[in-house]
Amino acid sequence: MSLGLYLHIPYCFSKCRYCDFYSAPGQRGVPRAYVDALLRELSRFAPDAPLRPDTLYFGGGTPSLLDPADAARLIAAAQPLPGAEITLEANPETVTEDSLRAFREAGVNRISFGVQSARDSQLKTLGRPHTAKQARAAFAAARRAGFENISGDIMLALPHYTQAEFDETLELIEDGGAPHISAYLLKIEPDSAFGRTPPEGLPTSDEAADFYLYAVEQLEHHGYRQYEISNFARPGYEGKHNLIYWDCGDYLGIGPAAHSCMGGKRFYYPADTEAFLRDEAAPVMDGGCGAEDYLILQLRLRKGLSLDEYKKRYGREFSTAQLAFVKNCVKSGYANFDGHTLALTPAGLIVQNSILAELL
C-alpha cells in the first residue's frame, strides 16, 4: 500500500481572513529548532530505516518560508522512493527564481501556488499578501527553475464575485504553465476573521453553486479534467499525495495539528507549536478509518465508489433502500450508476453532503 508523508510548516507572515487552519503568523522564516523537531519525529516513526514514502507534501502555513537547505535535510531523512511526488506549497511573494531553483535541487518536484484571485482588490479583501503581478512572476520563475509539475489555487464565490473574475484567474494560472488547478468555494469558517466579521457582497448559496458549475465547465473546456470535487488536471498531473487520502491509503502527518491514518488507526498531533518544539506533544489516538470514511472520500472523486471494492474491503453492500435512493439521484442528474460504480456528477458534488446523509 502507498504511503504519503505530510510535514506541517505552521509559520506564515500573516493569517488570511478566510483561514482557520492551525498556523503561527508573524514569522519571516522557519526556525531551525522546528526543522530539528520534525527530524526528531521522523526518526521516531522510522528508527531503524527511512520511511521511504511514495509522496511527500510540505503543507502549511507557508512552507516556502523554509530554507531550501532545511527542505533538503527533511527529504534526505525521509528518503522518498524513486519517482516520488514531492510537493511544496508556496505563496507567490515568498519565492524567487533562485529560491525555487534551490528547492528543486533539494528534491522538490511539484510546486503549488496559492493564487486565489487575479484581482488585487480581491486579494486585499482576502488578506493575501501578494499581488497578481507577483503571482505571474512566481509561475515564470518556477518554470525557469525547472518545475513542470505546477499547481495553482483558485477561490470561487468570493465577495462581489463574477464569472469574469474567475476567467481572469484561470487565464493567469493557465498562462503560467500550470497543468493542475484546485478550485475551492469560499467557506466562512467560524474561527476565521471572516467568521467573526463576514465580508459584504457574498454570493447566495444558489449563486455559489452556479459559480462552481461554471468553473467546472470552463476548466474542462481548457483541458483540465475534473478528478475530485475541487481538483482538476491535465492528463498525468493529478495530485498523487491527496489521492492517497481519498483512496484511504496510509498517510503520516508530522507537526502541530497534523493528522495521520496508519494501518487503519487515526491519530493527530495537538495544535501547539511550542509544545511540539519542547517534545511535549505526543500524538493522540483518534479512532479508526472505516467503511464510512471510504464511502465519503471515494464519492469526492469523479471516478466514484466501486461497490465491488467496497464489499471486498469492508464486507458491505448497498441495501434496497440505498439502491432506490441512488436510482433517484441518477434521475435527478446528481449521479451516474452502472450497477457497479456510483459516481457523482458536478451537480451532485454540490449537494454531496445531502447525498451522503442518505447513504450513511
Name these PLM-found stretches.
Residues 341-345:
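Minor-groove-contacting beta-hairpin "wing" of winged helix-turn-helix DNA-binding domains
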Residues 2, 23-47, 52-316:
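C-terminal scaffold of the Radical SAM
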